[in-house]
Curated annotation (Swiss-Prot):
PANTHER family: 23S RRNA (URACIL(1939)-C(5))-METHYLTRANSFERASE RLMD, RNA M5U METHYLTRANSFERASE. One of its GO terms (biological process) is rRNA base methylation. This is 23S rRNA (uracil(1939)-C(5))-methyltransferase RlmD. Residues 41-113 form the TRAM domain. The lineage of its organism: Bacteria, Pseudomonadati, Pseudomonadota, Gammaproteobacteria, Moraxellales.
């Protein structure tokens, strides 16, 4: 794999650390705890010195116990060759490591001090909560290094599972490195002893909520309102009964109705709220022009709360929007819909996918896992009125939303169908008309079931968008066996500062 240079976002600033860096990490509250005897031993144990030799696929440092390794108490360990996965450590560094979890085949730990050879790509994390909060795990590493590492993960998995490398590596797709996340679920818990509410992500490897005042990964419309949300919830009579906030944000479009605010929060309340509590929420949300929803039970119980007398509650949800200006498209969605969390990367991703398919006017395209039309509609623009796009999606609600978005954007060369794609659907009328190109954007589990019947579509070109490089590599092997060649592959930094790898690959049918 050739090294690549990624673009630098103006929203990201990094500071170089000192020659040594102390990282203060609170005791880890593990979900699956070792025995009480082991817990006491780990808690009392002194940090141990290790040389960091490499990185795991999730971005943790990897070290190995050497022969005759001497622990701090002078005892010579018998763990020769045992691996330790070390959070916050980078290759080449010497670190003092606090062991937090010990298992038969490996151990886990935190780097509490970099004692020598700090990696030149190490930076000071921009967020004050980094190391405690589990929302991200790579802020100590330059973003450019992160994305190159993610490409190396993809390359390794393609070789390991499919014994292949692409003909061409794509330039990594990068966008905003901070303030990019427009969808999330934040936990809520009121702590009576501190007389305050906690709002945010869970601590690393724990069910406990991290004590946050702000979040640098969330869109700043919410990320810098966390302290205000904590204060608000602390004043409610039902502060002990608020369990979660589900947030969704769209883009602000001046031409849209005033009632369609670009920020929506669903408050998961475990018991009905009093009128006084609802009034407090309404005042807070109205001041920020946010949509307010309450959810006392399942998804069907979500109820929008009117903030003014003019609010139209004839439908369960207000609308949110995002755009793909390259294709003159505006998408409408509701807060519970699946959408990509990074709008700037999504714009680049859709264009890249369309470019890779190299469509011509009049061609037929199949879009599997089409959602609300994020790829289908740009593809429809490219094939023109003489071409067509068929979108297939498991969710009937999303299928309806996609058709609505097509109609709203004046697109009439698309068809959308709701179908369980884990079963062979090639006997359906829409499936047997032949396709020139195919786009697939499956969930993390990949598209193994589809690989079994995909040859029946007889597509010349395939673009596969993946949120899990392991399943992409597995499915790549199946495509190679079916007569396709991997022409292009690359990664997209949809979740910067995390170990999450979003990738894209193009396949071309080999001529007989």
């Amino acid at each position: 794999m050739q090294p690549t240079d990624s673009k630098t976002s103006t929203s990201d600033t990094t500071e170089q650390p000192n020659e040594t860096q102390t990282i203060t990490i609170p005791p880890s509250k593990k979900k699956s705890k070792p025995s009480s005897k082991t817990r006491r031993r780990l808690k009392d144990a002194e940090p141990l010195p290790f040389a960091i030799d490499g990185l795991s696929h999730d971005g943790r440092g990897v070290a190995v116990y050497g022969n005759g390794f001497v622990e701090a108490d002078g005892h010579i360990t018998d763990k020769h060759g045992k691996k330790i996965f070390v959070s916050f450590a980078l290759p080449g560094e010497s670190a003092l490591v606090k062991i937090t979890n010990s298992r038969t085949s490996f151990e886990e730990g935190d780097a509490v001090n970099i004692t020598a050879n700090p990696n030149p790509e190490r930076v000071v994390p921009p967020c004050p909560h980094f190391g405690v909060c589990g929302g991200c795990n790579l802020q100590h590493w330059q973003p450019e290094a992160q994305i190159n590492f993610k490409q190396s993960v993809l390359a390794e998995m393609l070789v390991h599972q499919a014994n292949v490398a692409p003909d061409h590596w794509l330039e990594p797709v990068v966008g905003d490195r901070l303030g990019y996340r427009t969808k999330a679920r934040l936990g809520v818990r009121y702590v009576a002893k501190k007389e305050t509410a906690l709002v945010g992500f869970r601590e690393r490897s724990s069910n406990f909520l991290a004590e946050l005042n702000e979040c640098h990964i969330l869109d700043p419309r919410i990320g810098f309102e966390i302290e205000n949300l904590k204060t608000l919830i602390s004043t409610l009579e039902s502060r002990n009964k608020i369990a979660q906030l589900e947030l969704a944000m769209g883009e602000y479009l001046p031409e849209l109705p005033d009632g369609d605010q670009p920020v929506a929060l669903i408050v998961r309340n475990l018991e009905p709220l009093s009128d006084a509590d609802i009034d407090k929420l309404k005042v807070f949300f109205a001041a920020r022009n946010w949509q307010l929803y309450l959810q006392p039970k399942g998804a069907d119980s979500i109820q929008r709360i009117a903030l003014t007398a003019a609010d139209d509650l004839s439908e369960q949800f207000g609308r949110l929007y995002y755009q793909l200006p390259e294709y003159d498209l505006t998408f409408e969605f509701i807060p519970t819909d699946f959408t990509q969390v990074n709008l700037s990367v999504n714009r680049q991703m859709t264009k890249l996918a369309c470019d890779l398919l190299d469509l011509k006017a009049g061609e037929r395209v199949l879009d599997l896992f089409s959602g609300l039309g994020n790829f289908s509609l740009p593809l429809a623009r490219l094939v023109g009125e003489t071409g067509s796009v068929v979108g297939v999606e498991g969710s009937e609600a999303m299928t309806i939303r996609a058709a609505d978005n097509a109609r709203r954007n004046g697109i009439n060369n698309t068809e959308f169908y709701s179908q369980d794609l884990t079963h062979d659907c090639t006997d359906k009328p829409w499936a047997n008309q032949g396709f020139d190109a195919l786009l697939i954007d499956p969930p993390r589990s990949g598209a193994w079931e589809i690989m079994q019947y995909l040859p029946k579509f007889n597509a010349e070109r395939i673009v596969y968008v993946s949120c899990n490089p392991a399943t992409l590599a597995r499915d790549t092997k199946a495509l190679l066996e079916q007569g396709y060649r991997l022409t292009h592959a690359g990664v997209m930094d949809m979740f910067c500062h995390t170990g999450h790898v979003e990738s894209i690959a193009r396949f071309e049918k080999v001529s007989a």
